[in-house]
Amino acid sequence: MAPSHWRLILNGKSTDNADLREAVGTLRKRGIQLDVRVTWEDGDAERYVSEAVADGVHTVVAAGGDGTLSEVAAALAHHERDAATLPSLGLVPLGTANDFATAANVPITPLDALTLIAERVAQPVDLLRIDAEHGPRWCANVASGGFGTQVTVETDEGLKKMLGGLAYLITGMSRLGRIDPIGARFNGPDFSWEGEFIALGLGNGRQAGGGQALCPEAVIDDGLLDVTIVPALDGEVAATLGTLVTGGKQAALERVAVRARVPWLEIVSNQPLTLNLDGEPETSRHFRIACVPARLRMHLPNDCPLLGR
């Protein structure tokens, strides 16, 4: 039986979505007590989640892009309760790239996404906990660094609204001649690497930045963090970018990437390093990223590629 009381937290940029409004009405007619809260400024999602927990809501639905999903998931994870006693998590994809939803096969239409939540039992899912100079942060999908992070951070909001995921490609092309390598040391259980890199992916999920499959084999229920490092190899960068164009992004990654799968990873850099945590930048010289097993429960489709069990 579907949970009877849901709270949908809607990104304020999507308040004019007529399909979502109609879908909410349909679910209410099916007997779901479905409240809607709209985010306006920083901190709203966390406050709405706290209210939902206090009110005994069964399911919290993130309606927005990857950033909204991560913000709602992080707000749930901040509560010192285990997954079984927290509200379950649902997703209605309304963002520009919808990287998590795409990789997870979550339906893109609001009614189908809400129906999935009603029909599918929530599954345990992992989250990434990132400890840095400014305290702990949480990440639901992918933490990325290097070239891809700069593309995501620099992509204009207006361009994203007009062109969707194509905006990331245009911004990336404009940066091809100015890729600056970053030096860092990486250490985890049975894994160590040191050198300069141009791209980094730390995956709970598989893709970020408008379809970049940085961690193509990652699953979100194995308690492990997938690591992909693209080194700055002398004489290879131009060839790699050529492969990116002619053979596809994945072929380029497979050509040069260093990969690992670990429960946690420490990163130390002599210069400030910015990680993009599902759209939110965090800058530090020292990071510790841990995969926290089964931190939440989430409604996902039967054929979800991100579930390994």
Curated annotation (Swiss-Prot):
Q: Where is the organism placed in the taxonomic lineage, from the top?
A: Bacteria, Pseudomonadati, Pseudomonadota, Gammaproteobacteria, Lysobacterales
* Cofactor annotation remark: Binds 1 Mg(2+) ion per subunit. Ca(2+) may be able to substitute.
Q: Where's it mainly located? A: cytoplasm
**Nucleotide-binding among the record's keywords?**
yes
Q: List the disulfide bonds.
A: none
Q: What is its EC number?
A: 2.7.1.-
Q: Where does Mg(2+) bind?
A: V219, D222, L224
Instruction: Report the GO molecular function annotations.
Output: ATP binding; lipid kinase activity; magnesium ion binding
Q: What is this protein called?
A: Probable lipid kinase YegS-like
Q: What are the GO BP annotations of this UniProt entry? A: phospholipid biosynthetic process
* Record: residues binding ATP: T39, G65, D66, G67, T68, L69, S70, E71, T96
